[in-house]
């Protein structure tokens, strides 16, 4: 199993990141911590950066009239943060990511929500 540190000298250790191929076990779920709380600034910058200026993401009055009642965090921002959370654990040692088979967002994300991620090993190739 993956160790968090490696010895680099007498009484000297260095933090390590990532997993090697043999460290992945089909069916295992890896939790990614720490969490990340989404701010209004995060959401505003991301909507502007990606040119996704739908008012549901930043217009409070518009959002009040929707089923959500308040602005939604832009979904690609949610994905980007969760992917970033996983890097040090599951892909730090990878040469290339093979891709994602399934991404689910079962609930809306709002400003002030804290995200936690997890990855499940479905197969190895």
Predicted features along the sequence, with ranges:
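Hot-dog-fold acyl-thioester-processing enzymes
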Residues: 2-99
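Hydrophobic beta-sheet segments that form the core/acyl-binding groove
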Residues: 100-125
């Amino acid at each position: 199993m993956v160790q968090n540190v490696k010895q680099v000298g007498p009484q000297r250790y260095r933090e390590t990141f990532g997993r090697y191929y043999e460290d992945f076990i089909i069916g295992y779920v890896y939790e990614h911590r720490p969490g990340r709380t989404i701010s209004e600034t995060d959401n505003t910058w991301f909507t502007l950066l990606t040119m996704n200026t739908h008012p549901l993401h930043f217009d409070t009055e518009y959002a009040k009239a929707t089923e959500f009642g308040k602005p939604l965090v832009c979904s690609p921002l949610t994905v980007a943060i969760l992917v970033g959370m996983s890097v040090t654990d599951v892909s730090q040692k990878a040469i290339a990511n093979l891709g994602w088979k399934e991404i689910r967002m079962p609930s809306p994300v709002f400003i002030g929500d804290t995200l936690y991620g997890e990855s499940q090993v479905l197969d190895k190739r």
